[in-house]
Amino acid sequence: AGKYFEATDKNFQTEILDSDKAVLVDFWASWCGPCMMLGPVIEQLADDYEGKAIIAKLNVDENPNIAGQYGIRSIPTMLIIKGGKVVDQMVGALPKNMIAKKIDEHIG
């Protein structure tokens, strides 16, 4: 089964920005209700896109530098990053099919 990647301030450059695959990064926090609702969806997406895209989660409380760098104000916010650049952004606990559609636009 696919597992989402735990993104951090330390590994963001090498694992996310330098990745040759499209990366979905879910910015979340443990105190955020909608983030918790989105959690299982992110895990399902990690399964669905195993080998095709990287699905990552970044805890904004533990990794304030990256969250600040991308101006993340409300969570959950999801960024799709490809070739080191943000190519898409979604805010809120969206349904899985909407998120998947966005990822699909940036794969391949």
From Swiss-Prot:
- According to UniProt, the name of this protein is Thioredoxin
Top-rank taxon, per record: Bacteria
Its taxonomic placement starts with: Bacteria, Pseudomonadati, Chlorobiota, Chlorobiia, Chlorobiales
* Biological processes annotated in GO: cell redox homeostasis
| Disulfide bond found in the keyword field | yes
Q: Name one GO cellular component term.
A: cytosol
Q: Which family does it belong to?
A: Belongs to the thioredoxin family.
**Role:** Participates in various redox reactions through the reversible oxidation of its active center dithiol to a disulfide and catalyzes dithiol-disulfide exchange reactions.
Q: Which gene encodes it?
A: trxA
The record's CDD domains line, in alphabetical order, gives: TRX_family (cd02947)
One Pfam family hit = Thioredoxin
Q: Which UniProt keywords apply?
A: Disulfide bond, Electron transport, Redox-active center, Transport
Q: Extract the GO molecular function terms from the UniProt entry.
A: protein-disulfide reductase activity
Domain spans labelled Thioredoxin? 2-108
Report whether Electron transport shows up as a keyword of the record.
yes
Disulfide pairings: C32-C35
